[in-house]
Amino acid sequence: MEKFNIKKLTKPFNIEIDSIASDKSISHRCAMFSLFSNQTSYIKNYLTAEDTLNTLSIVEQLGAKIKRDGSYVEITPTSTLTEPSDVLDCGNSGTAMRLFCGLLASVEGSFILTGDKYLRNRPMKRVADPLRSIGALIDGRENGNKAPLFIRGVKELKPFTYHSPVDSAQVKSAMILAALRANGISRYKENELTRDHTERMLNGMGATLEYDNDGFINIHPLNGHLKPLNITVPTDPSSAFFFAVAAAITSKSRVLIKNVTLNPTRVEAYQVLKRMGVIVNFIEKENVYEPIGDIEVINNELNGVDVSENISWLIDELPALSIAMSLAKGKSKVSNAKELRVKESDRISSVVNNLKLCKVDFTEFEDGYEIVGGSLQKAVIDSHGDHRIAMSFAIAGLNCDMDIEDIQCIETSFPNFKEILDSLY
């Protein structure tokens, strides 16, 4: 098992970073949505991490021709998707598995979606059940709740009106993809807006998705093929956030992160840092599918904060935020975050158990935790095979020495994380 030793940073840093991993959510969607076109899509700066390369591989198994040169990808789909001769391996990616459920539900053929041991333990009923209710044939372990999942595509899905009990961009996206091949207009609603890359990208490609006065997304079935993509994938704000926290916890430090998506549903964690006292500036430069620009983060005194709203907008950043909270003045509290229990690990448990090793005072709740800020102490951290836990506590190592066990998981989303971390010294 690979281990990562991080030494305390003894000097401030002032850097610009333009090599942070490309956005994972957008990269997944670029690969998948290209299948709705009948022309070649051109994707620059595609994320070349394990999860997104697995998605490219699945797209290829479904019949598309792929040319790749580093992070530049061309995808030429076939007129109809091909039934694969082998299982479709999503690796560690819940996004890939759940979105492919929606995409494949109405594709003629049989498909088996599987993944690594962590993904095979994550709940899939939240997406499989609503898809089944509109005619999809999906089965799996534990009464259809766990992968491997077996999908037999049906020719025509029923249009639906669905108010989701779970605020999840993955569930929403799966239902939207299924609705594109339904035999009428479908309506989808969530209680709290989740990240909206799917809606933005599909509308940009020519699909019709409209919000009505009742808060439903009205999804019109496709009449033909969508336009191909010609896109440069921006920097991932969730990956960039580790270095925002690095600046926030390191005295007199500053970081400028270049070419990030500034989508409001993706920068909420930066707004929380702002509320904690950190200086955060957003500099928008362009808007193609997504607003894109730079984010500047400057160290300032950290104060405790309560986080209970817009949780779906910062669910991936909460482990890193917990490091800032541990070094802030006063108490911080996270609530309404039960979704953390079913991520790559039980992230509430993973965060608080590792904070305990760092001698941080905390209280754990079913839907979050409270942290008494002050200091961190050196510890040997168990990542639980979760890339965000591994990277969050690696950033904590800038404040005090830290050893992280099982760091191979970082490759799933941010292959050059260690290289950028080393550049701070």
Curated annotation (Swiss-Prot):
Keywords: Amino-acid biosynthesis, Aromatic amino acid biosynthesis, Cytoplasm, Transferase
An annotated Gene Ontology molecular function: 3-phosphoshikimate 1-carboxyvinyltransferase activity
Pathway: Metabolic intermediate biosynthesis; chorismate biosynthesis; chorismate from D-erythrose 4-phosphate and phosphoenolpyruvate: step 6/7
Matching InterPro entries: Enolpyruvate_Tfrase_dom, Enolpyruvate_Tfrase_sf, EPSP_synthase, EPSP_synthase_CS, RNA3'P_cycl/enolpyr_Trfase_a/b
Lineage: Bacteria, Pseudomonadati, Campylobacterota, Epsilonproteobacteria, Campylobacterales
Name of the gene: aroA
Biological-process GO terms, alphabetical: amino acid biosynthetic process; aromatic amino acid family biosynthetic process; chorismate biosynthetic process
Gene3D superfamilies: Enolpyruvate transferase domain
Enzyme Commission number, as recorded: 2.5.1.19
Residues reported in the UniProt entry to bind phosphoenolpyruvate: 24, 94, 122, 170, 347, 388
Family: Belongs to the EPSP synthase family.
GO cellular component terms, semicolon-separated: cytoplasm
Substrates-to-products reaction catalysed: 3-phosphoshikimate + phosphoenolpyruvate = 5-O-(1-carboxyvinyl)-3-phosphoshikimate + phosphate
Organism, scientific name: Aliarcobacter butzleri (strain RM4018) (Arcobacter butzleri)
The protein's name in its UniProt record: 3-phosphoshikimate 1-carboxyvinyltransferase
Compartment list: Cytoplasm
